Structure formats: structure tokens, C-alpha cells
Amino acid sequence: MNEAIIQLDHIDITFRQKKRVIEAVKDVTVHINQGDIYGIVGYSGAGKSTLVRVINLLQAPTNGKITVDGDVTFDQGKIQLSANALRQKRRDIGMIFQHFNLMAQKTAKENVAFALRHSSLSKTEKEHKVIELLELVGLSERADNYPAQLSGGQKQRVAIARALANDPKILISDEATSALDPKTTKQILALLQELNRKLGLTIVMITHEMQIVKDICNRVAVMQNGVLIEEGSVLDIFSNPKEALTQKFITTATGIDEALEKINQQDIVKHLPANALLAQLKYAGTSTDEPLLNSIYRQFEVTANILYGNIEILDHIPVGDMIVVLEGQAENILAAEKALHEAGVDVSILKRGA
């Protein structure tokens, strides 16, 4: 079992603004294991970016303890390392951002090399290191290009190479794909997954998009108004979200909210027969394809008209939603619901026939 490389225990972050006290982060505890791709998701103002400044050791928490790679860095607002040790610890943490922060007057390789200016490597070793990093991010042929000659995705690749220059153990991505188009976003996420596998890199994804979490993360924490409201494996959170905000994020990421809007406009739903109901079937690791739906017809004479279906593979396990119209005798539908529950399917009744 991997050990925690980042431990945040009971973190409070408070700011004083004139006579106001702003509680940006309230009693947050998060443990991130070595090799995790860990998502921290929330809307603007949730406290995500404030928490980042604590994780990357740029800000002391007001209260609580921070442990990074086995070393306590802050405890009850006080630094626990020497200035030199803290500097070295910060080098173990790379950062990429929504805005690439490249120097316009320097080429791609010069931007990467800039991160090595305090390195003990020789000039030749630095040159080799830069070449290796640009190859690692798939940009070796653009080494001599300036940022103005690069696409958004290519600029982010340079930023990733620069962030990896000092061989960090942790990479923090603060909304790093927010300015990219969907295709480029997928390419950057695929690159981050590859780096996680190749280098054993622990990655912390700060985002407001649950789609990003779904595509790349293995664990996720959901924040709201400075509070961590839900945390767990991506599989658990997607298959059984407990908090209203988490449910909202997931319905947006899976597209089921848009699907329901369209479904509710269909005649079959507007004029639902008295012996029918509209139901949402949610499942993880369970088959709700034709064999199961056929079985409730054979056993209970309940038909299932599928109006919408979505399946995601999370951690190698299928997780999905279906919207169906179940039709049959009332007692038979109840029996079919029970059979679905016993098969591991969560059944939510959205509308009953009139």
C-alpha cells in the first residue's frame, strides 16, 4: 500500500481584511498517496487555490499540520524546517497553471533551461536535461520556437517540461487545461497520465470540472465555501455521491442533466400511461444491459423502454446511468424494482403515470 506523500491535517486558513475575518479554508484534512492523481474540485471561491498555496509551501496555514514526503513543514501556523530545507522541499513540487507563464523572449528550450539556473548540473548536463524533458513531453522538434510560434497545447507542454526540470516528486496542476480546447485538453491529460506512470509522479489536479476528474483522477475531494464536503475514490464518488454539490458536478460531467431536459419534452414522458413510470437506473460493476432488462420482462412482464444510457469505465469498473420507462402492473413493477435493487442497481423514480 502506498504511503501518503502529502498530509494536510485540520487545516484552517484565515485572512484579515480591515475589520473582516475571511475563513478561506476550514478544518480540511486530506491525505494524498504517492502515485495518486488526486483531484480537488469546486467552484470559484471554494478555497481550492488557497489550499494549493499551502500544499506547495508558499503559505503557512493559520492552524493545522502539513507533512510532505515524511517531513512536517508547518504545524499550528509555524514553520518546522530551516529556510534551506524549505527551499529544497519546494523544489520537490512542480506547478503548472491555466496561463502558461512562459517568457516571450525565450525559446522553448530556454524557458525550460531557466528552471535549472540554480541547479548544480554542469552546462552540458543542463543542455542534455532540457533535450530529455522536451522529448518527454513530445516537443523536441519545437525546441527553438518562441511561445508566439506555439499553440496553447504546445505552450502547456513547455510549461510541464519546465515544471519537471528539478525532478519533483509532486506536480500540481492549477486549472491547467481551462484555457484549452477539448481535444487539446484530452492530449494534455493523456500526457499527465503517462508522466504519472513513467515517473511515479504524484499529481494534484485543481479544477472546477468534474469531467477532468473523471478522465484522469483516481481519488477526489469536493470543496465548497472552504470546507471539504466529500472525499473518496473516483469510483465511489461517481457511483454514490452523497452531497448535493457533488451530485450536481456529476450530472454535468455525465451529461445526464441535459439528457433529462430533452427526455422530459418527449411525448412518451409528457403523456406517461397510468401503468408506467419514468426511472433512473444507476449502477457500478453491474450489468443493466438487455439480459437484465429482459429478465424483468420474463419474470414480471415489465417492459423497459430505454430513453438514455451512459456508461463510463472508472478504475476498470463500468459505472453508468440509464433513463427508462418501466411499464406493467403496479405490483409487478414493485417486484421488478426489488429485483433491480438486489442486482446492485439503484432505482430512482422520476415520474409516475397519471
UniProtKB/Swiss-Prot annotation:
One of its GO terms (molecular function) is ATP hydrolysis activity. It catalyses: L-methionine(out) + ATP + H2O = L-methionine(in) + ADP + phosphate + H(+); D-methionine(out) + ATP + H2O = D-methionine(in) + ADP + phosphate + H(+). SUPFAM superfamilies: ACT-like, P-loop containing nucleoside triphosphate hydrolases. ATP binds at G42, Y43, S44, G45, A46, G47, K48, S49. InterPro entries: AAA+_ATPase, ABC_transporter-like_ATP-bd, ABC_transporter-like_CS, ACT-like_dom_sf, MetN_ABC, MetN_ABC_transporter-like, NIL_domain, P-loop_NTPase. The complex is composed of two ATP-binding proteins (MetN), two transmembrane proteins (MetI) and a solute-binding protein (MetQ). PANTHER family: AMINO ACID IMPORT ATP-BINDING PROTEIN, METHIONINE IMPORT ATP-BINDING PROTEIN METN. Part of the ABC transporter complex MetNIQ involved in methionine import. Responsible for energy coupling to the transport system. This is Methionine import ATP-binding protein MetN.
